[in-house]
Amino acid sequence: MTLRNILPLALLLGGATLAGCNGGKSITPKQAGEIEILEYCASEDHKSDKDHFRASATGESISRETAKKMSRSNCESALARSINSTMEIVTDNYVNSSKFNNVEEVTETFNDLARTVVNQQLSGAITVCERLTQKADGSYVSYRAIELSGAELVSKYNERLSQDERIRAEYNYEKFKETFEAELAKQR
């Protein structure tokens, strides 16, 4: 064999080898249609039930700590909105079923006390789920769920209502608690 014969043969074998190396890769086709999204800290276990108020939220930032603070703040806001709307319903139902002299004034007092209690209790909300992810661009996403005990909330609310002289004479804790628990049971 001469150099003239070996050179074309070597090029042919080299080309075949290179072409064979590329054939082992499989190309994953793009998924068509709907794609299921996994939401951390947002399952059924992280929703309000008859015993607890719960809220979940996310926070995103290039700073890890800021993302975590944002998710906590967003959770607290969502939890406060949920509790406040429930307390307004409970107050309306309780006041309307009771015999208060001035319904509007009593309702306003109950709602003001509810907001005060909720704001004080939010700091005691317990984190029941927390996940932290980092995106390809380096930013962080914090997923969080928090909860607040319904029993603790109604107990603190009762404590505050019992201190209000305008309401104390006509206030019935057991009836209020029953109204509260009935509304909380609807959460599930």
Residue ranges and their predicted role:
Residues 1-21:
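Sec-dependent bacterial lipoprotein signal peptides
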